[in-house]
UniProtKB/Swiss-Prot annotation:
GO terms for cellular component: cytoplasm. This is Translation initiation factor eIF2 assembly protein. It is found in: Cytoplasm. Keywords: ATP-binding, Chaperone, Cytoplasm, Magnesium, Metal-binding, Nucleotide-binding. Mg(2+) binds at D268, N270. ATP binds at K123, W126, S128, K130, K188, W189, E197, R199, R213, D256, D268, N270. Belongs to the CDC123 family. It comes from Candida albicans (strain SC5314 / ATCC MYA-2876). GO terms for molecular function: ATP binding; magnesium ion binding; protein folding chaperone.
Amino acid sequence: MTERDYTTFETIDLTSEEVLQCSYSNWSKLFPGKTFPSKIIKPLPSTFLDYLASESIRLPSNTNNKKITVLEADSDNEYSDWDDEEDQQQDAEHNDNVFSQFQDIQDKIDASIQEMGGAVFTKLNWSSPKDAKWIMPGNTIKCQNVSDVYLLLNSSDHIGDDLDNPFSEVQKKKTIPEKVDYELVLTKWQEINPAYEFRVFVKDHRIIGISQRDNNKYEFLQGLKSELNEKITQFVEDHVIPKLKSDTQLSKYIVDVYVSKNDIYIIDINPFSRKSDSCLFTWVELLDKKDKHDNHHELRLVENQNFAKEFSESQVPIEVVGATMDTEAMVELAREWDKLQAKEK
């Protein structure tokens, strides 16, 4: 094997400060009118963060569910449920006690949802729970009440990573802060066309690539490719790059944008790291663009239909999805799981 056969794994010098500057509240305030209306709830108490990080899914008892069902993983990663009335009553009391510890957060979520028209989508500092939309009726991240918000946040691996490993890609571990000021972001729900969502990669204050975000093929985009490239490039070069260059220390980052009929909106700004999806590029391709004077970049669109489901690594069999919509079905699913585990022992 010759030297040409090897691909050098190039590290990305990501700093903890870059990660923090990509926290929603830090960058969104720089772009008034260029983001969708949002409410930021912070600081978040440790009791609320512990609730999000727990291995059980608990929802407030003042929902429409007449019966509270709580599934918890034990040390063997097996699941059990409570059948008798006494256990259910005890669990209901514990459930109420858990939520009473951050009732003010729940009240703020309720108020924010109402203020923004009755529907929002949610995220923490960096990630949204898109990977957990399978658990919601209608396969959506649209939240219309507190329980929707809690269910998505509790079920998301992306949110878990925000809580447990926000600085995992930072090389200089000694610079990592001991404490993170977490925030809950509630953004007014928008009916958007996923075909017009794009991811822009910026390095050394210049665009090095633009990619379609949705993994479906849209024939009509091919005819708009040149126009979209021009519009997105102009927006990022005129608004995003100059502002982040003057007001932050960011020189590399990833910008998610939505191209509407009359404007372009910033959906998110992410750290420039392999933890972020490189979409239709490879990280080798992106990191190979080292000439700071080369302003040429490519916009890539999906050319072949992709039948793989997005976030499939975070999804579960259809029986589980059905169970999430029916508490009795969820209990029955837990019983069947225990029976299967017992047979294997």
